Every structure is written in structure tokens, then in C-alpha cells.
From Swiss-Prot:
Coiled coil: none annotated. Residues 251-339 are annotated as: Handle region. GO terms for biological process: autophagosome assembly; autophagy of mitochondrion; glycophagy; piecemeal microautophagy of the nucleus; protein targeting to membrane; protein transport. The gene is atg3. The active site is at 247 (glycyl thioester intermediate). The lineage of its organism: Eukaryota, Fungi, Dikarya, Ascomycota, Pezizomycotina. This is Autophagy-related protein 3. Residues 84-106, 129-138 have a biased composition (Basic and acidic residues). E2 conjugating enzyme required for the cytoplasm to vacuole transport (Cvt) and autophagy. Required for selective autophagic degradation of the nucleus (nucleophagy) as well as for mitophagy which contributes to regulate mitochondrial quantity and quality by eliminating the mitochondria to a basal level to fulfill cellular energy requirements and preventing excess ROS production. Responsible for the E2-like covalent binding of phosphatidylethanolamine to the C-terminal Gly of atg8. It is found in: Cytoplasm.
Amino acid sequence: MNFLHSTLDRLREFTPVSNTSTFRTNGQITPEEFVAAGDYLVFKFPTWSWADASPTSKRANYLPAGKQFLVTRGVPCHRRLDDDFAGDAGHDETVVRDGEDFRGDGPHSPGDDEDGWLRTGGLAASQEARVRDVRTVDESGEMGEREDDEDDIPDMEDDDDDDEAIIRDPKADNASSSRRTYTIYIAYTPYYRTPRLYLSGYLSSSQPLPPHLMMEDIVGDYKDKTVTLEDFPYFSNNIKMASIHPCKHASVMKTLLDRADAALKLRREKQRQGKAVPGSKDTGMEGLVDDFEKTKIGDKKAVLEGLKAGGNGNDEWEVLQHDQDFANEEEEVAIRVDQYLVVFLKFMASVTPGIEHDFTMGV
């Protein structure tokens, strides 16, 4: 199956490039917009940089020389997502397709296809708690009061281990070490007209991480489904990397754009009416970090909850910081096209929560 996907992806790279902007209508971007978004990312976060194809014969003619893809190196990853990473275990799995799926329930509802982001439980229609709320349910089925986060509860066993008393085997297998680093690449895909993320891992000894071991750092729901091992198209030596398939990137981005615009419009309307705006302090990218920490990439239902709630005090979406004022508020948008990759990386992090993507973004 992985071979079939890889073959189809290589054929799709020959798709004619479109230079018509559809960023606001469907979440797709043109090569020119990809370059603008890359320039913004590099300017704001210097750990990112542009790179050229090697050899130059691998260059894509729709991108400038020297700006073929984006790269950041040495991104830390300190934990494996093995069986101890519970996630949403114990819940039914749901395939999330495009945003239209939430408007119909039948087998032929819009967006009905086999592809999509796999979401596991915790978001049924009857669930009243938001994605960040964890509640207990008693024997009668009643939902209890919200409990303290387990991270705030000290563990008695934490004090039992004396690190200095532990005898460590220096010859232990490096492949199982918890310390890894990743090089992250962002390339442009002309078929889907979106960015595509590639991951190349290294062991603590700076030795290349075998491709199959990279899957230890991918959330189990996505392994071999939306994340596969692919050759990086801009290198000649066919280096296998973990790649997040871009088939649904545009629809997810469109959902986020719509939600951010709706929140901005509501805030401006309240400001014109002289009303206090709950949670209106501008936290910029920090709002995005908090919003995506516990929301999975296919969790568009949770994203849409903010719109249905009318932007109340629980809606923690914050507008991106603007570098310039807009003369006409009616044309003001929450996320500009040059800020595309910043938001893109935030929801990509939900696939690889063990990789510290924010290490690359000083927020």
C-alpha cells in the first residue's frame, strides 16, 4: 500500500502548476504564496532557512533557485509514542474527511470518500465536554465535576528512584534511546497545492535514525495511513523520510481560516458596540499553541465548536499578530497568506507531539 501511494505521489508531481490564488476559498496556495509564506517563516523564526535542491537538476521550475524547500535542524524529541501513549484509547475510531462531513450523516454526504484523517473517540455528538476538559462519569452515567490535571498531582513514586544509584549500560542500543533529534523539511506539492512536511531523524549519537524507527514518534492512528515513508524529492540519493500526506491539508486550513475570521469579526463587532470582549487580550501565536496542544489534526469538529459557541469566553482562538494596520476593517483577515506556514506547523505538531516543533518557533 505504501508503495502504491509513493508511486501515485511521484506521478502527481507532474501536475500543471496553477498561479490562481484560492487561499481564502479552499485553503490552497500557489508557488508564489508558498515562497511568501516561507519568507515570513524565515524572517520571524531564524531557525528556519531556505535551501536548494541537490543536485540542481532536482529543482522544481515553479520555485526560485535557492528557495526550493524550507529546513530546520536539530529539533529535539525526548520521548517515544509507544503503547504508553494512551491518546484516545478505548474509544471508537472515526474517519474525518472535509468540513462538509459535519453537515450530513448519510453514506453519500459531501466529502464521502475513503481518504481522511483518522480520529479516535472522545468527540461523539453526545459529548458535552470540550476537547481540553477531562471529566469522570459515575455509575449512574452522570458527568462529575472537572478534576485537577494529573500533571498537578505529585507522584509518590517519583521520589523513590535515585538517578545516581542507577547503573546504566553504556552499550545499550541507541535505537531505543529517548533522545533523538529531527531535521524537518517543508516542500510544496503542485497536485494538492499545499505544503508537505518531511521528517528525518537522528539518534543521540548523531547517527541517522532507521526509517522504520521514525514511526515510533508518530501518533499510532496515523502510522502508514496519513504518515508514510517517502523519498525526499529534492535529493538525488533517495533518502527515506517520514512524510505527512497532504491530501486533507487544504480543507483543514480552510476550516481554521474560517474560524479565525469569524472570531475576528465578532470581536470587531463587539468593539464597535463598546462591549467588553471576553479573552480579548492579544496573545498572538501563544493562542495557537494552546489551541492545538490537545487537538488532533483531523479534529475539525472540535475546531468548529468555537464557531457554534459564538466566540464565548471558552473560545481560545487568538488572532495572529499583524505587522501592519488595515485601512478597511471589513477587509481585515485574521490570518494572512504569508502567515500560512506558521499555522500549518501548529496543526502538523499534533501528528508528532513528541517532537518539539515549538523549539523552532520562539513564541
